[in-house]
């Protein structure tokens, strides 16, 4: 039993040390930088009044919490983050739209969004379907008419059979 507990204890110790070292590197526990707090960077050659304000700001930098005890959040950083999220989502949407258009052009079924585009492939297909259905209907009606004439005892003459063959060929 002791042989099994030593590797488990060692694994637990390694995991704990990794997590603890990562938590020390976490920015909330360290002092925030001047760039994150004010979006101001001290430039070289700053005058005496700026040095005094920089000393006053250094007290703020030591405490990452505001006076009321809540963490300090930079509004401009949140705005930049929101802009980045919007830009990435918008780019993804544009990519999906362009992929859809490309796929439609490959298939040959472009969706016409304006009157100027000519939906010829779709129209040709619908015309062919209509013509096929209409031809089938005419043949069925000709067969029905011929069978009715035979069943009713009317014999067709030479002229009627020629009309029947013409109707079947149409």
Swiss-Prot record:
Residue list for modification Asparagine amide: 152
Glycan attachment points: 133
Modified residues (Phosphoserine): 76
Swiss-Prot/TrEMBL GO biological process terms: adenylate cyclase-activating G protein-coupled receptor signaling pathway; mRNA stabilization; positive regulation of protein catabolic process; prolactin secretion; regulation of protein localization; regulation of signal transduction
GO CC, one annotated term: extracellular region
Residues spanning the signal sequence: 1-21
Propeptide: 22-79, 156-170
Residues with the Isoleucine amide modification: 107
Record bears the keyword Aminoacyl-tRNA synthetase: no
Keyword Glycoprotein among record annotations: yes
An example molecular function term from Gene Ontology annotations: type 1 vasoactive intestinal polypeptide receptor binding
Key words, A-Z: Amidation, Cleavage on pair of basic residues, Glycoprotein, Hormone, Phosphoprotein, Secreted, Signal
Subcellular location: Secreted
Family: Belongs to the glucagon family.
Protein purpose: PHM-27 and PHV-42 are two bioactive forms from proteolysis of the same precursor protein, that cause vasodilation. PHM-27 is a potent agonist of the calcitonin receptor CALCR, with similar efficacy as calcitonin.
Protein's recorded name: VIP peptides
């Amino acid at each position: 039993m002791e042989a099994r507990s030593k590797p488990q204890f060692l694994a637990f110790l390694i995991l704990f040390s990794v997590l603890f070292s990562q938590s020390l590197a976490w920015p909330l526990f360290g002092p925030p930088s001047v760039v994150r707090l004010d979006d101001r960077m001290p430039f070289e050659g700053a005058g005496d009044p700026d040095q005094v304000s920089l000393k006053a700001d250094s007290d703020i930098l030591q405490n990452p919490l505001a006076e009321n005890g809540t963490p300090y959040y930079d509004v401009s950083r949140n705005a930049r983050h929101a802009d980045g999220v919007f830009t990435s989502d918008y780019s993804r949407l544009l990519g999906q739209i362009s992929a859809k258009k490309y796929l439609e052009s490959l298939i040959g079924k472009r969706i016409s969004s304006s009157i100027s585009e000519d939906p010829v492939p779709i129209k040709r297909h619908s015309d062919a379907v209509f013509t096929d259905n209409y031809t089938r209907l005419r043949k069925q009606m000709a067969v029905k008419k011929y069978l009715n004439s035979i069943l009713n005892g009317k014999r067709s003459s030479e002229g009627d059979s020629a009309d029947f063959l013409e109707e079947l060929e149409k």
